[in-house]
From Swiss-Prot:
Classification via HAMAP family: PSII_PsbT
Assigned keywords, A-Z: Chloroplast, Membrane, Photosynthesis, Photosystem II, Plastid, Thylakoid, Transmembrane, Transmembrane helix
Pfam family, any one: PsbT
Entry protein name: Photosystem II reaction center protein T
PANTHER family named in the record: PHOTOSYSTEM II REACTION CENTER PROTEIN T, PTHR36411
Native organism: Cryptomeria japonica
Length: 35
């Protein structure tokens, strides 16, 4: 049960950090004519 909790915390933390960096800096991926 603890493994599931730790995994959830790890994934959520990485997600928050990823979105924070992603929204702080504009994405540097070339736009191929589509959203």
């Amino acid at each position: 049960m603890e493994a599931l909790v730790y995994t959830f915390l790890l994934v959520s933390t990485l997600g928050i950090i990823f979105f924070a960096i992603f929204f702080r800096e504009p994405p540097k991926v070339p736009d191929r004519g589509g959203k």
